[in-house]
Amino acid sequence: MKQIKAFILTGCPYCKKARLAYNELCENNASYREVPVDWILEDQQPDIADQYDYYYTPTMYVDEQKVYESHPGQTYEEIRDEVEKVLKAAPA
């Protein structure tokens, strides 16, 4: 199974939406709960965050490949769709 790294920032409204979307998707699809997600707080773990190329949070990598990077103005529905793409890309 592939590993997901999700970079988030404390106080980021898009990151909050991504976490809510992740929880909603896991509630509705048990197989998503099997996918390991490492939620990395950029402001608390800069040593890890600095190793990756992104500008906006949330950003999600699947096995070191960037699959999703948020951008300003995204709606909850857009974020949920992107998080689901990441979860679908993760199973081996």
Q: Where in the sequence are the language-model features?
A:
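Short alpha-helical
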Residues: 13-14, 44, 74
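Local sequence-structure signature of Cys/Sec-based thiol-disulfide redox active-site neighborhoods
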Residues: 1-31
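Thiol-based oxidoreductase modules, predominantly thioredoxin-like and allied folds used
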Residues: 32-46
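Short, glycine/charged-enriched secondary-structure capping and boundary segments
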Residues: 19-22, 53-55, 75-76
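Non-catalytic, surface beta->alpha helical segment in thiol-disulfide oxidoreductase systems
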Residues: 62-92
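A hydrophobic alpha-helix adjacent to the NAD(P)-binding/active-site core of NAD(P)-dependent oxidoreductases
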Residues: 49
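Structural micro-motif
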Residues: 52-62
